[in-house]
Curated annotation (Swiss-Prot):
Pfam families in the cross-refs: Isochorismatase
Origin: domain of life: Eukaryota
Gene: isoc2
Organism of this sequence: Xenopus laevis (African clawed frog)
Organism ancestry: Eukaryota, Metazoa, Chordata, Craniata, Vertebrata
CDD domains: YcaC_related
Protein known as: Isochorismatase domain-containing protein 2
Length: 205
């Protein structure tokens, strides 16, 4: 991949949606868990309409349970893992089979663990990484805040679910615009991002 600095443009034919470890055992421990899953489910609905590839992982499912049903991913393959990073050999092999892949759109939990490990591994491989901040969370808002800041320092793009979907569409004339518009017409649920702005500025250089 080119070493030139990228500006982070997204394209539906060059992007993959990653959904990380949204499992039953995390339901009571992750802050804003229902809201995070709701936003991730919106991302998944849109990805299906846009025919984007989707990678879903489960961390040690025998201990942490299956992916929660409200994500709407029952019909999709789950990649099991024990590593924090989603970039297992099996997932990496799947990515290599996707032509012209440039960007990964990343959602899930926990921000300071599996999300950050995945983002750093993907960046190291030369991919553009777009972290959907309103679809990522942790047990602690402090960990969430500093993990988002850390990923940005390393070159990931911090964004929102609606921002990603509109960029993927690119034009109101897109043949799937009206279908995706229905998904984003109702604002995404509050996942606690505004409370993070009392801490370190995520956008400082």
């Amino acid at each position: 991949m080119s070493s030139l600095r990228r500006i982070g443009k997204l394209g539906e034919r060059s992007s993959v949606l990653f959904l990380c470890d949204m499992q039953e055992k995390f339901r009571k421990s992750i802050v804003f868990f229902p809201e995070i899953v709701s936003v991730a489910a919106r991302m998944l609905q849109a990805a299906k309409k846009l025919e984007m590839p989707v990678i879903i992982t489960e961390q040690h499912p025998k201990g942490l349970g299956p992916t929660v049903p409200e994500l709407g991913a029952d019909d999709l393959k789950k990649y099991t893992k024990t590593s924090f990073s989603m970039l297992t050999p099996e997932v990496e092999e799947e990515l290599q089979s996707i032509p012209d892949l440039r960007s990964i759109v990343l959602c899930g939990i926990e921000t300071q663990a599996c999300i950050m490990s995945t983002a750093l591994d993907l960046l190291d491989k030369g991919y553009d990484v777009h972290v959907v901040a309103d679809a990522c969370s942790s047990r602690s808002q402090v960990d969430r805040l500093f993990a988002l800041s850390r990923m940005r320092q390393s070159g990931a793009f911090l964004t929102t679910s609606e921002g990603v979907l509109l960029q993927l569409l690119g034009d109101a004339k897109h043949p799937k615009f009206k279908e995706v518009q229905k998904i984003i017409m109702e604002p995404a649920p509050d996942s606690g991002l505004l409370s993070l702005f009392r801490g370190p500025n995520l956008f400082s250089t």
